[in-house]
Swiss-Prot record:
Belongs to the FHIP family. InterPro entries: FHIP, FHIP_C, FHIP_KELAA_motif. Able to activate MAPK/ERK and TGFB signaling pathways. May regulate the activity of genes involved in intestinal barrier function and immunoprotective inflammation. May play a role in cell proliferation. Expressed in colon. This is FHF complex subunit HOOK-interacting protein 2B. Residues 184-213, 510-530 are annotated as: Disordered. Residues 197-213 have a biased composition (Basic and acidic residues). It comes from Mus musculus (Mouse). Disruption phenotype: Mutants are viable, fertile with no apparent defects. Mice are more susceptibility to colitis induced by dextran sodium sulfate (DSS) than wild type littermates. They display significantly increased tumor burden compared with WT mice assessed in colitis-associated colorectal cancer model induced by azoxymethane (AOM)-DSS.
Length: 744
């Protein structure tokens, strides 16, 4: 009974309520806004204290309500047609530019954003919409910290979302009137009849909706004098396209001091470059300065950093994310910390853009970053005569490589560092490439530069790209010219020399009275399972250092078990990284009829071997880095690398050296030096304890030599462990089960 009574009352009220003319209400609100400018004399009242925000809200609500009422027809309603035909958005854009009343620009940004997001009818194809959108974009993103930053970000977010849904809009928003002539025919063939009027430059076009009240039409046509006499800069872009206004606006917003707004702007650019349409992606790269602008901002951040940065300080910020680019507050402050964090964060962002972008955009952006940052900015610093410039730029490049993930940018980095020449290097070649200069820096007079450059190459070798290992090592090992012709293949070790018969090995023992820790027997033939051979090879490395020079046993920490388990994990990781490179399972067969040619290990291995040969005379930190790079190389599961670096029984061609033969010479030198150092064993044990932090680090005589001996012992154990997990050489991809603790 009550429900029936309520229904009757509602029906009675509805009968008395007059029907609302949406168009009339819409025009009345617009007239209210325009009359404010005619009648108001107060220039200081903020826009939010006038009735303008309320009237704009009513106009928006009318547009949304009208669209819901006409959802079945799919055509633009009278109010929307009125908005388009009378260039209301153009007029609002002009009012926003004038910033009168104060805060009007903020209201205009909000209205544009809400209309474009809440009205479902496609709008950005219309000239009377995308032209004011372009003009409004020019008003924002130019001054960091402006009062409208929040509204600008919301506005650009709506535009990027629309482009993501319809990539064809990209040309309208970025180029505008220039594109109209090219697309007019296609547009008119698909647009509804009532919509076509929206493209025409008429202030008062004829419309059935307006014909309901001729007085209303005439009255309105006299109202918007504001829109008839617009300033020249608000007219269509007659002098050329609006050059990437959305992009420049977004890049400006990325510089906002408000991290949330900057992050949202970066996410909007990410939406823009990941458009699915190949045509839109091509347009974005060829008809705009998008890629170059992003790369140029990266270079600006680089130039804003101090010229001199400590590599240790750079290392504290490695791995910084673009989503959290601010420097960690708990780290020690240093000059340029915030600038460095901003640079590394933007580089990570560029790398992420290239990863997520359409292939066309990714390639173009990668080339832009390579050209602007690598070639034009970093390369002069890397080749500079100033040691500080070399040191800082090398450390920064290492940090960039560590963050780099995108395949396209990785390819550009490889080409930048190593070039494209895949021919084996000759000893007489002049150092004409950047890569060759960097290799020479590994043997620089400055130990700091040598360490920093070795770290760079170690990072390079860990990237999932074959060009690094091929250019640095493999191309010089092809053909196995390091093996003496007529020598047996590596599967048979019967005729090889044992260590005491090696001419390199005996040099160090002449009249020394010292002997190696154990005498390895002549290498027997490899058994079917390879266990005999691996035992001999492992023992060859473990027995290199004489007992007088070993100290790890005195500290009850042999360390070999730990090396094996570490090597196993690193080898599995390396094997999975190179599995798809199609490497052979065994070494290339020797051609006995091929004339002998001189072998050159390549500049990279040459420098590393020269460095390891001076291990007893180099600083401890430098020795650690040299051995780290060599261990990283030895892990690669290529049969030629395995043979050249880890096979003690290889029969070397005349004049050639291998890693093992270099170590043998070092041991020979060590045995002669031991006799000249009083209380050698006691001092060596003390130095090891100092390095482990067990005793205070007081300075000792022959400290460099003693530290070098400790590194040498550990390096030999590490090589033995790597050989163990990699063997046999003819099947480096075999998956061995990890050895149990304590049973190695």
């Amino acid at each position: 009974m009550l429900s029936r009574l309520g229904a009757l009352l509602q029906e009675a009220v509805g009968a008395r309520e007059p029907s609302i003319d949406l168009l009339q209400a819409f025009v009345e609100h617009w007239k209210g806004i325009t009359h404010y400018y005619i009648e108001s004399t107060d220039e200081n009242t903020p826009a939010k204290k006038t009735d303008i925000p309320w009237r704009l809200k009513q106009m928006l609500d009318i547009l949304v309500y009208e669209e819901k009422q006409q959802a079945s027809s799919g055509e633009a309603g009278p109010c929307l047609e009125y908005l388009l035909q009378h260039k209301i958005l153009e007029t609002l854009c002009t009012l926003g530019k004038a910033e009168y009343p104060p805060g009007m620009r903020q209201q205009v940004f909000q209205f544009f954003s809400k209309v474009l997001s809440q009205v479902q009818h496609p709008l950005l194809h219309y000239l009377s919409v995308h032209r004011p959108v372009q003009k409004l974009l020019r008003l924002g993103g130019t001054v960091p910290g402006s009062l409208t930053e929040k509204e600008e970000v919301q506005f650009t977010s709506v535009l990027c979302s629309k482009i993501q849904q319809d990539p064809e809009l990209l040309a309208y928003i970025l180029e505008g009137k220039k594109i109209i002539g090219k697309k007019k025919t296609a547009r008119e063939s698909t647009a509804p009849p009532k919509d076509i009027a929206g493209y025409r430059d008429k202030d008062c076009p004829h419309s059935d909706a307006l014909n309901r009240d001729p007085g209303l039409d005439k009255e309105h046509c006299g109202v918007p004098a504001l829109s008839i006499h617009l300033p020249a800069e608000t007219e269509g872009p007659e002098n050329g396209p609006g050059e990437s206004n959305l992009i420049t606006s977004l890049l400006g917003l990325c510089k906002s001091k408000k991290s949330r707004l900057a992050l949202k702007a970066q996410e909007n650019i990410l939406l823009l470059v990941s458009v699915a349409s190949p045509a839109a992606a091509t347009y974005l790269t060829q008809s705009t300065s998008c890629c170059m602008a992003i790369a140029e901002h990266l270079c600006q951040l680089y130039r804003s950093m101090p010229a001199c940065l400590d590599p240790a300080d750079i290392a504290t910020l490695e791995g910084i994310s673009w989503r959290l680019p601010s420097a960690p507050s708990d780290e020690t402050a240093f000059p340029g910390k915030e600038a460095l964090a901003a640079f590394l964060g933007w580089f990570d962002y560029c790398d992420h853009l290239i990863t997520e972008a359409h292939t066309v955009v990714a390639d173009a952006l990668a080339k832009a970053v390579a050209e602007k940052l690598f070639v034009e900015t970093l390369q002069p610093q890397l080749l500079h005569v100033s040691e500080q410039s070399i040191l800082t730029s090398t450390a920064l490049l290492t940090a960039l490589l560590r963050q780099l993930r995108s395949p396209a940018l990785l390819q550009e980095a490889m080409t930048f560092l190593l070039g494209t020449d895949q021919h084996p290097a000759a000893i007489e070649d002049s150092p004409h490439t950047l890569g060759t200069h960097l290799i020479m820096h590994c043997d620089h007079l400055s130990d700091e530069i040598s360490i920093a450059t070795l770290r760079l190459f170690e990072e390079l070798l860990q990237k999932p790209h074959e060009q690094a290992i091929r250019s640095l090592v493999l191309q010089n090992l092809e053909g196995r010219l390091y093996v003496a012709r007529g020598s047996p293949e590596p599967e048979s070790y019967e005729d090889t020399l044992d260590l005491e018969e090696d001419p390199y090995f005996t040099d160090g023992f002449l009249d020394s009275g010292l002997q190696p820790s154990t005498k390895p027997p002549p290498a027997p033939a490899t058994s079917s399972d390879g266990k005999t051979a691996v035992t001999e090879i492992v023992n060859s490395f473990l027995c290199l250092v004489p007992e007088e020079a070993k100290t790890s046993a005195f500290l009850e920490e042999n360390g070999y078990d730990t090396y094996v388990h570490d090597a196993y994990g690193l080898f599995q990781e390396c094997s999975s990284r190179v599995a798809h490179w199609g490497w052979p399972l065994g070494p290339a067969p020797l051609d006995s009829h091929e004339p002998e040619r001189p072998f050159f290990e390549g500049r990279f291995l040459q420098v590393l071997f020269d460095r390891i040969a001076r291990i007893l005379d180099q600083p401890y930190s430098l020795n650690l880095q040299v051995t780290s790079v060599l261990s990283r190389l030895a892990l690669f599961p290529h049969p030629h690398i395995h043979e050249y670096l880890l096979d003690p029984y290889i029969s070397l061609a005349p004049g050639c050296r291998s890693l093992f033969s270099v170590l043998v010479r070092v041991i020979g030198d060590l045995m002669q030096r031991i006799q000249r150092v009083p209380q050698f064993s006691g001092k060596l044990l003390l130095v090891r304890k100092q390095l482990m932090g067990q005793v205070p680090g007081e300075h000792l005589d022959h400290q460099t030599l003693l530290q070098g001996v400790v590194v040498l012992e550990e390096f030999c154990k590490e090589l033995a462990a790597i050989a163990f997990v990699k063997f046999p050489p003819h099947g480096p991809y075999l998956n061995f089960s990890p050895p149990p603790e304590g049973q190695v």
